[in-house]
């Protein structure tokens, strides 16, 4: 929070009352999980606030965690995925970081959308009647943090939530205010930085030598053609070169190995390093590095840190996104879980094509989701639901 405050020149002593609410868009939703209740505050037109409460006859956090896990399993998120392993969390932790469902006496859900329907009924239906804007911003709490909001299913309309709304997520209301009102020091820029498949063959983590990521390279090359930008690939994607460009671009896309929990991205070791064996500071892009950079980026896309092991890494996603937001980025696009490499490529091509056509990040995201949902090969929820836009909605002049 201190980083965010310094970047956006907001005093830590500032009070967030009516003045704060006046700066936030309508249909901003704050959710809080109590012992047996879920509390909702929805910002309306004219600074009005709608308050509501959903009472549950059980421990709210445990039940919501159970529902979330059921949803993941029912749509196939927990199944192995055919994709490049860009995550080093399991190596760092010396164990698999796959999340296990909490114990519950609840009987298994019966149909594919059962948990998605129940999640909708618990956290959207109580406030659906006051969500009158197409764009909604959700500030979740506890077990609701980065639930699969786009795939929540309304049994009445037979629609997924993303079909009715363009959804963004914010780590906190104060964070959202800082991001949506950047300082006067912000300078417009139209350039893009695309980083893919850094040369990491000299790097060992936990005794394991990192391997190349050809799909990551293919990804940024294809995006580069859409944006008419030459990407940094292989040996050119050094930490020194990336750091020198970070603060001068409007768009950052990184497809590389990463450690989500530590907030680290692995780049090509600087060639002029003093020792043959690269040290961490030669190749690791860390949260501390980002804290020292004044980013001008309107959008950061992180296509890294995922594996095919059926993991959902909500806390890590928030952490690394906060680092980029704290360094000055306006918004960050991340994925909660890994998807098939071909599906990821299809998604990215659609997303960037809509961006260059002038659509906002949230609209381009929805269009890309819809593109996959209507496709023959990637129509299942596990392919289009993981992508989350954290922070502001932005337009890019590319």
Model-found features: residue ranges?
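Catalytic cores of enzymes
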Residues: 12-69, 75-398
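Short, charge-rich amphipathic alpha-helical segments embedded
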Residues: 1-7
């Amino acid at each position: 929070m201190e980083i965010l405050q310094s970047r956006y020149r907001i005093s830590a002593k500032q009070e967030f009352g009516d003045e704060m609410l006046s700066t936030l868009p309508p249909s901003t939703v704050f959710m809080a999980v109590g012992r047996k209740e879920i509390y909702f505050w929805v910002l309306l037109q004219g600074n009005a606030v709608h308050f509501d409460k959903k009472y549950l006859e059980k421990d709210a956090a445990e039940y919501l965690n159970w529902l979330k896990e059921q949803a993941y399993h029912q749509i196939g998120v927990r199944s192995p995925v055919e994709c490049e392993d860009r995550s080093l969390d399991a190596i760092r932790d010396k164990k698999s970081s796959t999340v296990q469902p909490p114990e519950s006496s609840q009987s298994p859900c019966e149909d594919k959308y059962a948990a998605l329907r129940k999640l909708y009924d618990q956290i959207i239906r109580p406030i659906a009647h006051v969500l009158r804007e197409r764009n909604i911003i959700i500030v979740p709490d506890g077990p609701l943090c980065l639930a699969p909001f786009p795939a929540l299913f309304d049994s009445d309309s037979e629609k997924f939530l993303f079909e009715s709304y363009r959804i963004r997520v914010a780590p906190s209301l104060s964070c959202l205010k800082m991001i949506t009102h950047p300082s006067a020091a912000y300078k417009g820029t139209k350039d893009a930085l695309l980083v893919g498949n850094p040369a990491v063959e000299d790097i060992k983590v936990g005794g394991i030598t990192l391997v190349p990521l050809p799909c990551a390279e293919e990804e940024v090359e294809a995006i580069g053609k859409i944006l008419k930008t030459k990407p940094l690939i292989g040996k050119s994607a050094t930490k020194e070169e990336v750091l020198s460009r970070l603060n001068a671009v409007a768009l950052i896309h990184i497809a590389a190995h990463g450690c989500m929990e530590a907030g680290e991205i692995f780049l090509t070791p600087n060639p002029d390093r003093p020792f043959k064996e690269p040290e961490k500071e030669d190749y690791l892009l860390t949260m501390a590095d980002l804290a020292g950079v004044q980013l001008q980026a309107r959008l950061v896309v992180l296509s890294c840190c995922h594996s095919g092991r059926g993991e959902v890494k909500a806390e890590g996603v928030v952490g690394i996104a906060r680092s980029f937001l704290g360094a000055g980025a306006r918004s960050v696009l991340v994925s909660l879980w890994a998807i098939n490499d071909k599906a990821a490529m299809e998604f990215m091509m659609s997303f960037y094509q809509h961006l260059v056509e002038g659509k906002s990040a949230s609209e381009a995201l929805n269009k890309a989701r819809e593109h996959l949902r209507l496709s023959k090969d990637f129509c299942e929820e596990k392919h289009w639901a993981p992508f989350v836009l954290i922070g502001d909605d932005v337009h890019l002049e590319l």
